[in-house]
């Protein structure tokens, strides 16, 4: 029962020396290259981001070290959050397009059978 109530940490924030908010490493647990590379792409589209990269420390670990460094003192949390939101939007668009295509295919198939 205790295992059910325990909640694993899925995201940690590790700040660089000097407690500067513009240079942060986010540790994402239970994730791999699928999220890492997609999120890196979305974050790098932001012109305020100076550096963005990720690493997986060991092949047997399921965590990503995701680092963001911004320009002009902008907190790294902002482009991280924006990148996640944009990635969700892209995934939602792909899902909607896929579902629409499936629906159209089924309608065409039914029309051809009549």
UniProtKB/Swiss-Prot annotation:
Example of a GO MF term: DNA-directed RNA polymerase activity
UniProt xrefs under Pfam families? RNA_pol_L_2
Which is one Gene Ontology cellular component term of this protein? RNA polymerase I complex
Location of the protein in the cell: Nucleus
Q: Name one GO biological process term.
A: transcription by RNA polymerase III
Query: What are the record keywords, sorted?
Result: DNA-directed RNA polymerase, Nucleus, Transcription
Q: Which PROSITE patterns match?
A: RNA_POL_L_13KD (PS01154)
- Nucleus as a keyword of this entry, yes or no, is yes
What HAMAP family does the record tag this protein with? RNApol_arch_Rpo11 (MF_00261)
Q: How does it assemble?
A: Component of the RNA polymerase I (Pol I) and RNA polymerase III (Pol III) complexes consisting of at least 13 and 17 subunits, respectively.
What the protein does comes down to: DNA-dependent RNA polymerase catalyzes the transcription of DNA into RNA using the four ribonucleoside triphosphates as substrates. Common core component of RNA polymerases I and III which synthesize ribosomal RNA precursors and small RNAs, such as 5S rRNA and tRNAs, respectively.
- Family, as annotated: Belongs to the archaeal Rpo11/eukaryotic RPB11/RPC19 RNA polymerase subunit family.
What is the protein name stated in its UniProt record? DNA-directed RNA polymerases I and III subunit RPAC2
In its UniProt entry, the species of origin is given as Xenopus laevis
């Amino acid at each position: 029962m205790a295992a059910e109530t325990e909640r694993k940490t899925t995201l940690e924030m590790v700040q660089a020396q000097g407690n500067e908010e513009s240079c942060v490493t986010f540790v994402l647990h239970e994730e791999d290259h699928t999220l890492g590379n997609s999120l890196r792409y979305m974050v790098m589209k932001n012109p305020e981001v100076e550096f963005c990269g990720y690493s997986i420390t060991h092949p047997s670990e399921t965590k990503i070290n995701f680092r963001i460094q911004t320009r002009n003192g902008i907190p790294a949390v902002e482009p991280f959050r924006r990148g996640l939101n944009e990635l969700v939007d892209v995934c939602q668009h792909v899902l909607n397009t896929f579902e629409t295509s499936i629906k159209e295919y089924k309608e065409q198939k039914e029309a051809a059978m009549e």
